UniProtKB/Swiss-Prot annotation:
Pfam families, per the entry: GSG-1
Subunit structure of this chain's protein: Component of the AMPAR complex.
Compartments reported by the entry: Cell membrane; Synapse
Family: Belongs to the GSG1 family.
Taxonomic path: Eukaryota, Metazoa, Chordata, Craniata, Vertebrata
Protein name (Swiss-Prot/TrEMBL): Germ cell-specific gene 1-like protein
UniProt keywords, alphabetically: Cell membrane, Membrane, Synapse, Transmembrane, Transmembrane helix
Topological domains, Cytoplasmic: 1-8, 147-166, 231-322
Keyword Kinase found: no
Membrane topology reported for the UniProt record: Multi-pass membrane protein
Length: 322
């Protein structure tokens, strides 16, 4: 089932709106990557083996009072031992991270740190470049959406709408390319941070989160909208060229002595007169045998034009009538 030009424009607007919504949601959320951190438990934190926890002084002659201070807390100058082995001595903290924050959840509490500060100094420039690219991606996507809406709801003629359609397609393609580059740069920075970031942050395991999925879904919808818009423009231009060849052929068959400038003027007059009254001039007369009526009785201002009474040309593709 072939969609009409107006339906294709509406579909492009919807796809662009979805892409814009998903890109904003992904950029300002911190669920691009999720996983767990493996950290050593504080001394005597284990409820199961707390009875085996001992604090021994550095000096073998130290008494039990040396292991604790006056407040009853463990003395930081004392070596602390616990008898937990394997994974019993580690705590696994869930974390999620995005462009702006990396948050850890442990025992019902969540603590967040700036991901920009966590990234290595060598990667901060790339990270800021990815942030700027994401901003440009959203801005260009918004501009493309506004142009598509203008082309869809505008009451201007068909030719002006076609120009807006072409510009919207170019803007949307550029935004999609910027978004793809931004996503890839961020993931590169994240993987470097996993290996070279702070030791207390490096994840034990990690996987892609729903923000990452939204970002690439936004890119897919963006490129789909741009391809659909560009397809509408290209299809219309090819139809223009084909119909113009048929038009010029029929005009020359009916009047072989007509000046080429006159033929070009007749074509432009026909296109603009039709596009100002109908949405799609090519749906106005389907088929090769449809007549094309052009009034040239008022043409007197072109060089070499012959001033005559009002007359018309009824041209058909088979060349039998003129």
């Amino acid at each position: 089932m072939e969609l009409s030009r107006r339906n294709r424009s509406l579909l492009s607007v919807v796809l662009n709106l979805l892409a814009l919504s998903f890109s904003v949601a992904a950029f300002f959320t911190s669920y691009w990557c999720e996983g767990t951190h493996k950290v050593v438990k504080p001394p005597c934190l284990s409820a199961v083996k707390s009875k085996n926890c001992q604090a021994l002084a550095l000096n073998s002659s130290s008494t039990g009072s040396d292991a604790t201070d006056t407040n009853g807390t463990l003395n930081p100058n004392v070596v602390h031992y616990n008898w937990e082995t394997g994974d019993d001595k580690y705590a696994f903290k869930y974390f999620h991270t995005g462009f702006w924050f990396s948050c850890e959840k442990h025992q019902g509490e969540e603590a967040c740190r700036s991901f920009i500060e966590l990234s290595p100094d060598s990667e901060k420039g790339v990270l800021w470049l990815s942030v700027i690219s994401e901003f440009l991606y959203i801005i260009l996507l918004s501009l493309g959406f506004l142009l598509m809406c203008l082309e869809f709801f505008s009451s201007s003629n068909f030719i002006d709408g076609l120009k807006i359609n072409a510009f919207a397609a170019i803007i949307t393609v550029l935004s999609g390319l910027l978004g793809m580059v931004a996503h890839m740069m961020y993931m590169t920075v994240f993987q470097v941070t996993v290996n070279l970031g702070p030791k207390d942050w490096r994840p034990q395991t990690w996987y892609y989160g729903w923000s990452f999925g939204l970002a690439w879904l936004s890119f897919t919808l963006c490129m789909s909208a741009s391809v659909l818009t560009l397809n509408t423009y290209t299809k219309t231009i090819l139809e223009f060229k084909y119909r113009r060849r048929i038009f010029e052929k029929n005009v020359r068959e009916c009047n072989p002595f007509l000046d080429p400038e006159m033929v070009r003027f007749l074509w432009e007059k026909y296109i603009f007169s039709v596009s100002s009254t109908v949405e799609d001039p090519f749906n106005w007369h389907k088929g090769f045998g449809s007549p094309i009526f052009v009034d040239i009785g008022s043409i007197t201002d072109l060089p070499g034009a012959v001033k005559e009474e009002e007359r018309g040309m009824d041209l058909e593709d088979d060349g039998d009538q003129c």
